[in-house]
Amino acid sequence: MIQPQTHLNVADNSGARELMCIRIIGASNRRYAHIGDIIVAVIKEAVPNMPLERSELVRAVIVRTRKELKRDNGMIIRYDDNAAVVIDQEGNPKGTRIFGAIPRELRPLNFTKIVSLAPEVL
């Protein structure tokens, strides 16, 4: 469950290291975002000499949350951290590599590029 002011790790090599959620895209009064939701975030920590800089506004899709994810078959998945992947306006990742496991729930949400770059899909 990600809400405004939540800090997230970045799971790609776009140049950002840490994000802070400031808005959840898709509904005017939604309080929480879950895996697969798009957020507007500000970069809190960035790698030097990269295209993305600190205090820049970006869009990101949430790929891991510490809150449990319940599947239809009864399986429950929980990750160790809250993480997101920085995306552009079309939904493609800005980085060329994805770090860590990615849930398969992203595939039907048209984030197939992120799923194909991921080293592990749970």
Curated annotation (Swiss-Prot):
The keyword Cell membrane does not apply. It comes from the Eukaryota. It is found in: Plastid. Keywords: Plastid, Ribonucleoprotein, Ribosomal protein, RNA-binding, rRNA-binding. GO terms for biological process: translation. GO terms for cellular component: cytosolic large ribosomal subunit; plastid. GO terms for molecular function: large ribosomal subunit rRNA binding; structural constituent of ribosome. Gene3D superfamilies: Ribosomal protein L14. Coiled coil: none annotated. Part of the 50S ribosomal subunit. Belongs to the universal ribosomal protein uL14 family. Binds to 23S rRNA. This is Large ribosomal subunit protein uL14c.
